[in-house]
Amino acid sequence: MPKTRRQRTRRARRNRPPTPWPISQDLDRASYMDTPSTCLAIVYRPIGVPSQVVYVPPAYIDMPSWPPVQSTNSPGTPSMDALSALLSNTLSLASPPSPPREPQGPSRSLPLPPLLSPPRFHLPSFNQCESTPPTEMDAWNQPSGISSPPSPSPNLASVPKTSTPPGEKP
């Protein structure tokens, strides 16, 4: 079965989608190229008046006139000409420039310490500071296996027994 080409329908220019800006009939644009910079002049005219190009002079940017530059050299300071002459005398092409020397650093045999050390995480320990005496809260928080100062709980030896286990005599 032979392929058939579909005819493309061309959109007429009049059926264009509307532009986002209003198209007005009362606008004439005149461009003047008589200056190095291009000036675009927009001339508005009322509808119905025959179009006539009105010359709009280009807007020249008026450069401000600066006061003459005063000498910035204080007495005793050499001028830039004297400095450049001195520099050109010291840098002559007769002697090639010496290669820059590397600064004397530490010997290469010793390993350099790392610039950044990895973070060190300390596990929480109960003996955080050996030199400081434990506070009252530290005494309560210590596990029972570690010897601790006498706690404020009553001693079992000083409490009178109210009941005796069977088999024992009071």
Swiss-Prot record:
Changing S98A: No effect on function. Residues 1-16 have a biased composition (Basic residues). Residues 82-95, 143-160 have a biased composition (Low complexity). A motif (Nuclear export signal) lies at residues 83-94. A motif (Nuclear localization signal, and RNA-binding (RxRE)) lies at residues 2-19. Changing S79A: No effect on function. Residues 1-27, 69-170 are annotated as: Disordered. Keywords: Host cytoplasm, Host nucleus, mRNA transport, Phosphoprotein, RNA-binding, Transport. The modification Phosphoserine is found at S151, S153. It is found in: Host nucleus, Host nucleolus; Host cytoplasm. Residues 161-170 have a biased composition (Polar residues). Changing S125A: 70% loss of function, no effect on Rex's phosphorylation and RNA-binding. The RNA-binding motif binds to the RxRE, a complex secondary structure consisting of four stem loops and a long stretch of stem structure, present in incompletely spliced viral pre-mRNAs. This region also contains the NLS which mediates nuclear localization. These overlapping functions prevent Rex bound to RxRE from undesirable return to the nucleus. When Rex binds the RxRE, the NLS becomes masked while the NES remains accessible. Belongs to the deltaretrovirus Rex protein family. Rex escorts unspliced gag-pro-pol and singly spliced env mRNAs out of the nucleus of infected cells. These mRNAs carry a recognition sequence called Rex responsive element (RxRE or XRE) located at the 3' region of the long terminal repeat (LTR). This function is essential since most HTLV proteins are translated from unspliced or partially spliced pre-mRNAs that cannot exit the nucleus by the pathway used by fully processed cellular mRNAs. This is Protein Rex. It comes from Human T-cell leukemia virus 2.
